[in-house]
Amino acid sequence: QVQGQLHTAQTFGLDYVNTMSDPAREAADCGAVVEYFDEQPVAIVEDRALLADKTHLARLKIPDPLGGGRMHNSIKALALFQEQIGREKIIEGWVEGPIAEAADLRGINTLMTDFYDDPAFVRDLFSFIVEMELRFAREQVNAGADVIGIGDAAASLVGPDLYEEFVWPLEKQLVDGIHAL
C-alpha cells in the first residue's frame, strides 16, 4: 500500500498520501467477519454481523490499535510514510465515523431499525465506537499522520432529526477529540 501510494503521488504530482484502503479495518479487529476479493476492497459479511445479537456489545472489547491486526497495519504504513517522505507530502490517517462503523458491526438494515426500537443501544454503540476511533486516531498521529480523515457516509441515510439526535453529537465528539490530539 505504501509503495503504491508513493508511486501514484510521484507520478501525478500529488502532495498527499493516505492509508484508507477499506472501511472494514476496525470492525475486523473487533472480530467481525470480513471477505477479501481480488478486484474490490475488503467488505463486511453483513449476514454474519458481529453484533447481530446486540447483547454482545456489553462484552465487546476495544481492540488495541498496536495489537497486530488490521489497524496496526495502517499504523505501520503511516510510520513507513513518515520514514520515507517525512514532511514532503501530507500524510493522512483514517477512522470510521460512528454510524458507518455501527453499520459494519451491527448491519446497516438492523441499525436503522435500532434507532426506533432501541435508541439506548444505539447511543451505547456509538459511544463505544467513538472511544475506539479516538484510540486508533491517537496511534495514527503518533505514527506520523498529519491529518485524520473520517468516513461516515452512512450518516446520509438518516433524516435530519435522527442525525441531530444521534449522529451529530458523536461526530462532533470524534472531531473534537481528534483536534485535541
Question: Across the structure, where does each feature detected by a protein language model lie?
Answer:
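A contiguous, low-structure linker/loop signature
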Residues: 23-64, 87-88
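Short, glycine/charge-rich beta-strand/loop segments that flank catalytic centers
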Residues: 19-29, 93-100
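Catalytic domains of carbohydrate-active enzymes, especially glycoside hydrolases
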Residues: 3-21, 139-144
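Short intrinsically disordered, low-complexity coil segments enriched in acidic
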Residues: 1-9, 89, 180-181
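An N-terminal domain-start capping segment
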Residues: 1-5, 53-63, 98-99, 105
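Active-site loop segments of alpha/beta catalytic cores
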Residues: 15, 40-46, 63-181
